[in-house]
């Protein structure tokens, strides 16, 4: 069970709602517009274009590489050898970067990056639920960005603007659940613990709402998802960080792994180029699941079971789940998630935790075999401890959340999921690997 003090959990819940709003789970539209963007009429037309773009979305399913179709066992052996990183040490010649992440109330995990020459430092969230790289610009003089570090393009010798002429540039308008921002785009070098990524496309925030951004404990977002397949600007000019890393052959293995701790005093971790056996229970098998959509790190979800209650969902319909390092909880469509939550009769004083059911997520692995991932009450119940009277309160780490089409409906496997299963994201083979997390170190 994950423990929080009373004030911590209250913040966890609120910050989750705020942070999920800033994840680009909703469509982001890029169009070329005049630089006089602040004109109300222009903004109205811009929003209309955003809605029209949404209508064009089609579910984009991808398949395993054809060369593996007739030799899936060989493929699995190949991929497991390829990821022998879990079972053995990486040779010194392998290039990888590791970063410990600041644990902010067990709800957000914050890392460091540098941009430009000379480098300018920023606190960011690494977010697999987004492909956008967004950092406040010095051009942003009001709203939520005023309290954060801001990138000064004029001070970087390596910055390149996408400005075509004095009157025209490409902007991105992002509408979130409770806020909005406007970004212009440029290119500069990015540094992560010694790894240099050349000419990465960066979204520079030039305007954003006060709420929720002013309250967030980080400066920006580094999206680790895929470029929007339906957005021609993104796929051609605005590649995500992991796509740029792969394109520039910076890592021998185009994978990254994410660890979420149980304890508040422990750091989270992200590693590019390998997984770390420190974070996996020794002897546990990695289960690999094929990515089924280029919108997210999205995998097939065959069902969710409560074995002791003869309860199941998703068995008669196609469900899908996005593994998202930027979300705190496990969420799903209200029509499916609410019956599940109602069947978990948790007492708020935590008195009946031992009698609560195991929740089982049924998935299909890369071999086409059924895999069941079990979550005990200790995994999905969040406990609040009061420092004043030594009492406890408990809440369920599951929540109903309706993501509108075309991105939804979809389940989100956030940090409650990743805390139980150390997660590996394979951008070479478009796979998600999970293995039981080791928290005893």
UniProtKB/Swiss-Prot annotation:
GO molecular function: aspartic-type endopeptidase activity
GO CC annotations, alphabetized: membrane
Disruption phenotype: In the mosquito midgut, number of oocysts is normal. However, oocyst appears immature, enlarged, degenerated or vacuolated, and fails to sporulate resulting in a lack of sporozoites.
Chain segments annotated as coiled-coil in the UniProt record: none
Gene3D superfamilies: Acid Proteases
Membrane topology annotation: Single-pass type II membrane protein
The name this protein goes by in its record: Plasmepsin VI
